[in-house]
Amino acid sequence: MNNFASNDPLVIAGTVYSSRLLTGTGKFKDLDETRLATEAAGSQIVTVAIRRVNIGQDPHQPNLLNVLSPDRYAILPNTAGCYTAEDAVRTCRLARELLDGHRLTKLEVLGDKKTLYPDVVQTLKAAEQLVAEDFQVMVYTSDDPILAKRLEEIGCVAVMPLAAPIGSGLGVQNRYNLLEIIENAQVPIIVDAGVGTASDAAIAMELGCDAVLMNTAIAGARDPVLMASAMRKAVEAGREAFLAGRIPRKRYAAASSPVEGLVG
């Protein structure tokens, strides 16, 4: 942990993290590449699709936990692939059993297979049920400020609005909505989905997001390990720029050199 990270930690559900880059574990060519990219990203929280990745469900298949140990990483099970609140809740219960009572979970309930936008009605329903069952819910949602606040009020420990559709690589498409969500939030706001390259991650952090979660942008790159390293630096730079405070935008030039005492 560097000095800057130790003085500016990310806190989720009372747990302190020095890294603000969360990474997924899907789409890599093999578990070794997953491990190398995760290490290069410097991530402390890694998300796992319970319906797609083996963490003990199948004893005859390679187990992700053998390369990404829960002793080193916070394993964040997610409900990717769920289209109803009932399926999502059932998946979270399975994850808790597989991870020995693990409470932190990433909720996502999708609306359709084309856009992979969240079904906000089903998301709210599932969030209420999971919070009632004492899960610590980090929730994937749209960039609707009203919905984001409602999810916070339900008891979600982090709200994760999309920057753009999952896997699209389009970057932040609606800065205004993200700013509204950030300014009104009392829990961490983590951009989830849509990042394509390092500048996208930096922009999200410059806006004031607390962290960024990504998978495809790293796993789908020509060199996933190198891209993971780039994303790590982008998130750190974006956070520092946010804290430093950018200069205001102006229509006209403003000289950077003093005009007093000019010769001639």
Curated annotation (Swiss-Prot):
This is Thiazole synthase. The active site is at residue 106. Pathway: Cofactor biosynthesis; thiamine diphosphate biosynthesis. CDD domains: ThiG. Its EC number is 2.8.1.10. The keyword Cytoplasm applies. Keywords: Cytoplasm, Schiff base, Thiamine biosynthesis, Transferase. 1-deoxy-D-xylulose 5-phosphate binds at residues 167, 193-194, 215-216. Catalyzes the rearrangement of 1-deoxy-D-xylulose 5-phosphate (DXP) to produce the thiazole phosphate moiety of thiamine. Sulfur is provided by the thiocarboxylate moiety of the carrier protein ThiS. In vitro, sulfur can be provided by H(2)S. The keyword Hydrolase does not apply. It comes from the Bacteria. Belongs to the ThiG family. GO terms for biological process: thiamine diphosphate biosynthetic process. One of its GO terms (cellular component) is cytoplasm. Homotetramer. Forms heterodimers with either ThiH or ThiS. The gene is thiG. It is found in: Cytoplasm. It holds the Pfam family ThiG. One of its GO terms (molecular function) is thiazole synthase activity. It catalyses: [ThiS sulfur-carrier protein]-C-terminal-Gly-aminoethanethioate + 2-iminoacetate + 1-deoxy-D-xylulose 5-phosphate = [ThiS sulfur-carrier protein]-C-terminal Gly-Gly + 2-[(2R,5Z)-2-carboxy-4-methylthiazol-5(2H)-ylidene]ethyl phosphate + 2 H2O + H(+). InterPro entries: Aldolase_TIM, Thiazole_synthase_ThiG, ThiG.
